[in-house]
């Protein structure tokens, strides 16, 4: 009998796509909120505009797996490039929300990766991508309102690296300056800021380097077997994928060899 799939129906975290850093979007978003104020409606305005990509039920010791899942998505972000469309202000329960189109494939893939890494992700009910504008004390009928914004979602757009981020946020986290205080916040543009200095790992590293790199990392980051560790480092180095960035960020020895382009053993 197949194992029953676990859902985050009692979530404690979510993967967040913050929006406060996009000035074009924020100009229209704040204008929409000001219309609610001018209409004299008693509501709580959303101070942290965002899109929840998926909900999670995880423990703190799984944060690294979430980080690696996000980094894995960023490795393939070109597959999700396009425009994110915000439109159709309407009531969803007690909240006035915008429909969001363009994150469907990203949602499906990050849920799959998170589950593969042992994290309980997504809910048994259908995911409805939306951006909350305001919350009311009770369900309310709102007269037709207009909103449309197209946000380019590209690693590089008009020669500028993206401002997009993917975050891990604990439900109930405090809010500062339009953003949640997150457990992890990963800039999508870092995918283009890292580049191995040589085509092959073996061009500048030797087997003697493995223990020095392992000593800079947390236990379990690298396989205990040197050959397996070498294979993993070589694979990610030559493809410029997430684990290369992780080791580059956390191993002084690894960064030094990359900078010097030569083993120092």
UniProtKB/Swiss-Prot annotation:
InterPro entries: Coronavirus_NS2A, Cyclic_Pdiesterase, NS2A-like
Pfam family, one: Corona_NS2A
Gene Ontology cellular component list: host cell cytoplasm
Keywords: Host cytoplasm
Superkingdom of the organism of origin: Viruses
The family this protein is said to belong to: Belongs to the coronaviruses ns2a protein family.
Name assigned to this protein: Non-structural protein 2a
